[in-house]
């Protein structure tokens, strides 16, 4: 038996992406965006309303960063999603965030968030879909495995459950991609 819910925007997991930009004065801005992910090879997409300060900044600078919210930074990352830079221009600092300028794009890397995807704007359509070219991915060494790869367990990213409005941690590994299915004959 199944229960029908009708049309809902429920996909699991939904990464909690923290979008970083600079304004026209070179000051950092940041917002929380749960609707985003990979768009194509070396491309990301994130849904942003046109009235966001972040949207204005991306259109002006042509660049942005996406960082993954973590369990350790859940309060700060939630804060930048519930407060608008149009109303609280210094919300980046109020969240306790610090930044360094990306070496690859005109956007900030948030020091407190361990993994960042650095992007140049490809296009921003009238529906609020922002598509960016991935120019670089950087990560703090403490979240790398012994093989030098990003370790999801060490990253400890949170995901957003839009049906309950809860942030969740990822669980344990369930299997190896492109390998588990080979067991079926």
PLM segments and residue spans:
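Basic, polyanion-binding surface patches
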Residues: 1-185
């Amino acid at each position: 038996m199944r229960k029908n819910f009708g049309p809902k925007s429920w996909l699991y997991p939904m990464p909690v992406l923290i979008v970083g930009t600079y304004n026209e004065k070179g000051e950092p801005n940041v917002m929380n965006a749960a609707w985003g992910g990979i768009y194509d090879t070396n491309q990301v997409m994130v849904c942003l309303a046109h009235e966001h300060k972040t949207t204005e900044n991306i259109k002006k600078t042509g660049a942005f960063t996406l960082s993954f919210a973590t369990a350790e930074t859940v309060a700060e990352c939630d804060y930048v999603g519930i407060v608008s830079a149009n109303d609280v221009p210094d919300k980046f600092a109020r969240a306790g965030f610090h930044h360094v300028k990306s070496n690859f794009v005109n956007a900030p890397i948030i020091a407190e968030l361990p993994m960042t995807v650095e992007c140049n704007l490809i296009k921003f359509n009238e529906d609020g879909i922002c598509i960016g070219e991935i120019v670089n991915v950087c990560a703090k060494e403490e979240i790398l495995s012994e093989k030098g790869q990003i370790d999801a367990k060490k990253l400890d990213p949170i995901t957003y459950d839009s049906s309950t409005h809860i942030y969740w941690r990822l669980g344990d590994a369930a299997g190896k991609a492109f390998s588990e299915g080979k067991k079926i004959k």
